[in-house]
Amino acid sequence: MKEKFELVSAYDPAGDQPNAINEITKKVLAGQRHQTLLGATGTGKTFTMSNVVKEINRPTLVIAHNKTLAGQLYSEFKEFFPNNAVEYFVSYYDYYQPEAYVPSTDTFIEKDASINDEIDKLRHSATSALFERQDVLIVASVSCIYGLGNPEEYKSQVLSLRMGMEKDRDQLLRDLVEVQYARNDINFQRGTFRVRGDSVEIIPASHEEYCIRVEFFGDEIDRIREVDALTGEIIGDREHVAIFPASHFVTREEKMKIAIQNIEKELEEQLKEMRDNGKLLEAQRLEQRTNYDLEMMREMGFCSGIENYSRHLTLRGPGAVPYTLLDFFPEDFLVIIDESHVTLPQIRGMFNGDQARKQVLVDHGFRLPSAMDNRPLRFQEFEDKTKQLVYVSATPGPYELEHSPEMTEQIIRPTGLLDPKVEVRPIEGQIDNLIEEIRIRMEKNERVLITTLTKKMSEDLTDYLKEIGMKVAYLHSEIKTLERIEVIRDLRVGKFDVLVGINLLREGLDIPEVSLVSILDADKEGFLRSERSLIQTMGRAARNENGKVIMYADKMTDSMKKAIDETNRRRTIQTEYNEQHGITPKTIRKEVRDVIKATTAAEETESYEPKTKQINKMTKKEREKVIEQMENEMKQAAKDLDFEKAAELRDVILELKAEG
């Protein structure tokens, strides 16, 4: 029987959510290829999409434009679908420095990466879930368009073990090694197996909490048990178990032999061409590097950077489309693209950036030309591999507008909150006028965001406001992650009343205490004053019942007019709905989350103090202790699936290491 998505939620769809759910569901079931959910900030878009997934009941891929957002979505979907396979698939590098070559200085930068074991486990959990069940929802970052092994090869190498099956114990051990499990009787961890008399214990690549114990009687599997990997407690008996490969790049021995021959052939041709063109140094470099890799592949079955030979390992021709996570899904899967106005351009840009870097490596003898085929998908290829897409955004981009002119709107917030009122005021006397407005907000214990166009303007304004005794902070691009989190927290708890910045579009700035957003130089056309950016910036005041936006401008630009008209249109719809249903808007009360405990010193002080200053005074030894403590906290956060906290910690650790 086909498993069903089971939505668990304390509340029912409200406002225009029911209409949006019905409309999108109907269009998907009718086979419409593209559609867009135009959802204003704070209208519960994730809840709407969860309802659509439940109604359609197909495997679903949700793509977000960065790990933090993917982590937030993953947590939300997991809450809505606790009994289904909600998975997380992002790049497993904690940090990643791709190999590169700078010809001008003759500098080769080796690939340097730290792989997060927890995320690697979740990636395996995602791919294996797709082969085991139907009710799968995977939240991914754009890394899902990067090369992965051949899904057919991956599937064909799954070890299927049943009770009563005839199988020789030693044959099982050989099979496990072939799918890249390592025997380790001492350090028993994910992706390893150990042998104890007549039983073999395996920890699958997609889990580490439990291991599978296969007990033999002669040449027959007598019993299969699930055992707690830590305590050895028996969880239960299994009739059947599927052991998925420990790597996504699995290649059978016979295929590996053909691949090695093809690599040798390509190497020969490339060396000849290089020598004919007088590139002797490059030829020597290429020969040495490739032969070393080939030797490793013959002996070990893999080498460092094996993904650069993926075209040969999957026996594809030059220029062929790489296999990606999309190929692991069944034919009828649904794709949801979150914040599509940012995510789609990102997908479009991946291929060109990757090729430019690799071309330099090939030209200078660091890689064979076939390495160019270990690449992300081109946008056209991405379109070919996806059959039905739903774009979700408060400000859809040109691609969405072109492909789905009839959008599904979701404008009413379940809280009854309205889009802010918008006023345009002249630039002359803007600062005095702004100060008056700030004072009104301070009396009501509300906060103000001010966005300027230049760094100098931000600094001057911050200094001036400080001089006249206002509590103000300046959020600029050089500010470190930890400080940024602290500044936002300080604004919320009232340490500051005003926050000045240039780009207020980054995540984390949805602050319910903010009742005024002031946009200086609103009539200067450009990226941060485009229609889309203005609507997003204005949305920062939409979480407060007294939300208001003041634009300072001497003329009305086209972008301003469109943004104001759209906001007023939404506000009218929201007001009418509230009047009809007797709803009074109420500001969202959101608790102030504690900043990550960065230092033991900070934990001991009851009053809230900026931790960064304390860190600066530390000795090297104390700093190392803090980093170690934070790394443990980061790993724990990743284990608890709080990826937002883990990402914040990771950034802070990198900054501390750089300063140390």
Curated annotation (Swiss-Prot):
A motif (Beta-hairpin) lies at residues 92-115. Keywords: ATP-binding, Cytoplasm, DNA damage, DNA excision, DNA repair, Excision nuclease, Nucleotide-binding, SOS response. GO terms for molecular function: ATP binding; ATP hydrolysis activity; DNA binding; excinuclease ABC activity. Residues 430-596 form the Helicase C-terminal domain. The keyword Cytoplasm applies. One of its GO terms (cellular component) is cytoplasm. It comes from the Bacteria. One of its GO terms (biological process) is nucleotide-excision repair. It is found in: Cytoplasm. Residues 26-414 form the Helicase ATP-binding domain. ATP binds at G39, A40, T41, G42, T43, G44, K45, T46. Residues 624-659 form the UVR domain. Its main location: cytoplasm. Belongs to the UvrB family. The UvrABC repair system catalyzes the recognition and processing of DNA lesions. A damage recognition complex composed of 2 UvrA and 2 UvrB subunits scans DNA for abnormalities. Upon binding of the UvrA(2)B(2) complex to a putative damaged site, the DNA wraps around one UvrB monomer. DNA wrap is dependent on ATP binding by UvrB and probably causes local melting of the DNA helix, facilitating insertion of UvrB beta-hairpin between the DNA strands. Then UvrB probes one DNA strand for the presence of a lesion. The beta-hairpin motif is involved in DNA binding. NCBIfam families: PRK05298.1, uvrb. Forms a heterotetramer with UvrA during the search for lesions. Interacts with UvrC in an incision complex. PANTHER family: UVRABC SYSTEM PROTEIN B. This is UvrABC system protein B. It comes from Oceanobacillus iheyensis (strain DSM 14371 / CIP 107618 / JCM 11309 / KCTC 3954 / HTE831).
